[in-house]
């Protein structure tokens, strides 16, 4: 009771919803100013992207998201697959949901998907090559060439992993 009353007192004094949420969150997550989020290939509950999206959302709430973005086109691949909105996802993270609780919420929310559909979708997004999309081809080529990657053969997730590795290696 005291903790809740104190929390509301802090909220009333600071008028900053983010600080209030952070005060009560159970799971702090990664500091993305010091380390990258999980690879988009890391599957949580069978979903590609999910671990990375969770890391970015938690970091956003804690104020240490660095140069990453939550509810970006990558995250929206997951949200679109399930028919969800980033704000709904964020609301669950704000409640302090663990990775497992997020999997359970994702399975129960939005469009119902079978384990086979989830696996097939995860495999498809992992193999996505932006170079094959004429609208993204030039942009993607600009992004991967400084990293020594071939835009024609590099999947999106490989580029993200390489960019994370190189970016944090420079910072170290």
Roles of regions detected by a PLM:
Residues 64-106:
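Amphipathic alpha-helical packing elements
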Residues 41-48, 69, 73, 77, ...:
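Alpha-helix boundary/N-cap detector
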Residues 26-65, 125-171:
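Polar/charged low-complexity regulatory segments
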Residues 89, 93-147:
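Amphipathic protein-protein interaction modules
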């Amino acid at each position: 009771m005291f903790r809740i009353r104190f929390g509301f007192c802090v909220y009333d004094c600071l008028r900053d919803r983010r600080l209030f949420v952070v005060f009560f969150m159970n799971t702090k997550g990664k500091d993305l100013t010091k380390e990258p989020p999980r690879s988009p290939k890391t599957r949580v509950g069978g979903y590609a992207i999910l671990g990375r999206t969770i890391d970015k959302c938690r970091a956003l709430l804690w104020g240490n998201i660095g140069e990453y973005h939550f509810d970006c086109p990558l995250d929206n691949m997951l949200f679109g697959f399930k028919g969800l909105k980033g704000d709904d996802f964020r609301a669950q993270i704000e409640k302090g949901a663990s990775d497992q609780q997020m999997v359970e919420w994702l399975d129960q929310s939005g469009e119902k998907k079978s384990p086979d559909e989830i696996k097939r979708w995860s495999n498809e997004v992992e193999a996505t090559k932006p170079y094959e999309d004429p609208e993204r081809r030039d942009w993607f080529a600009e992004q991967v060439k400084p990293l020594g990657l071939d835009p024609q053969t590099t999947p999106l997730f490989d580029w993200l992993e390489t960019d994370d590795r190189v970016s944090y290696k420079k910072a170290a």
